[in-house]
A protein has these predicted regions:
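Sec-dependent N-terminal signal peptides
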Residues: 5-14
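Immediate post-signal-peptide N-terminus of mature secreted/exported proteins
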Residues: 22-72, 162
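Short helix-adjacent coil turns
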Residues: 67-71, 115-122
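Solenoid-repeat scaffolds in large eukaryotic assemblies
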Residues: 74-76, 82, 123
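Short, solvent-exposed, charged loop/turn and helix-capping segments
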Residues: 85-102
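The canonical Cys-X-X-Cys-His
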Residues: 130-141
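Short cysteine/histidine-rich metal-coordination sites, predominantly Zn2+-binding motifs
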Residues: 148-158
Length: 162
């Protein structure tokens, strides 16, 4: 995630430098793989909100079962990764930035607090509140048919307990 942010910062600085020169979307950005992209090409391949929300949901799911298994470090890691993904959305989909920041302040921070306290009962309560906030946000944004629900079993590919 941080590499994506650094790339975005690099691209933004090139854009600022080249604004005077002409069409920004034609500015070429080199990669570490000896490939070159134009700013326009990079803009076209940015993930949509649905792709990032899928990551949100998956990490949210892992956080629940990690906390349930008292693996508070894994739960904390997953929530922090959600926030990093949120930063990408705030940059690439700025119309959602205010709403996401509000969600972070009203829900995610309370969830993080329950993780810091290592309090399963509090975590479960805040997790359910956060789930309700997610589903309400989907409705407000015209997607009432998207309802997150916690899978009944923990992921088999990742050990939850320490």
């Amino acid at each position: 995630m941080k590499n994506k942010f650094l790339l975005f910062t690099f691209v933004a600085s090139i854009c600022t430098t080249n604004m005077i020169a002409g069409n920004i979307s034609d500015t070429i950005v080199p990669t570490k793989h000896n490939k070159q992209f134009t700013i326009g090409e990079l803009a076209e391949i940015q993930p949509g909100l649905g792709s990032i929300m899928r990551e949100f949901g998956h990490r949210f799911y892992i956080a629940y079962y990690a906390a349930k298994a008292n693996n508070w470090d894994l739960a904390k890691y997953q929530i922090n990764e959600i926030l990093e993904a949120q930063e990408i959305v705030e940059v690439t989909r700025p119309k959602y930035a205010k709403q996401l920041k509000s969600f972070e302040n009203s829900s995610i921070k309370k969830l993080q607090n329950s993780i810091e306290k290592k309090d399963w009962k509090l975590f479960k309560q805040k997790y359910n509140e956060t789930t309700n906030a997610c589903n309400a946000c989907h409705t407000v944004n015209g997607h009432p048919y998207i309802k997150y629900q916690l899978p009944k079993k923990e992921p088999k590919y990742l050990r939850m307990s320490l």
